[in-house]
Amino acid sequence: GHTIIDYENGRPCGCGRKGCLDMYCSIRGVVLTAQEMVNGYYGETKLKDIEANTMTTLDIYNAAVNGDELAIEVFRKTGETLGKACANFATFLSPEAFIFFGGLAKAGDLLLKPAKETYNKYILSLYKDKAKFLQSGLEDGTAAILGAAAVGWEINK
């Protein structure tokens, strides 16, 4: 989340740096992207009816699944950013899969389809079409506990 992806004009992050992936590919990041895009959008969109300070990712998701072009574009842009970050990550770790968890991952193909397409556009040809993009089936709050347990298991082997 705190890998810098925008060195020039990055959004300020709570960690104290600017341009962190988390400020673009998270629940908060999606809202910020939507707020930025609404300001210059001249077409019809449900997002214009929502006060900027009350807009949520769920609002954007609901608009997208109901065909709102701007909301769909927000998820596409977020997915593209995520796909580029995954391509960079895969260059030095070559994972078999990326497993996404949490509120934003619940957007499913709205997010993951453009992420995978962009990943395949930017990844080394050696890795193209090899990594899977999966949505976790774990319950909220379970991933951190299982991850910590797995680390403990590996340390004690």
Predicted feature locations:
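Short, intrinsically disordered, charge-biased short linear motifs at domain edges
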Residues: G1-D6
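ATP-binding/phosphotransfer module of carbohydrate and carboxylate kinases, centering on a glycine-rich
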Residues: Y7-P12, R17-K157
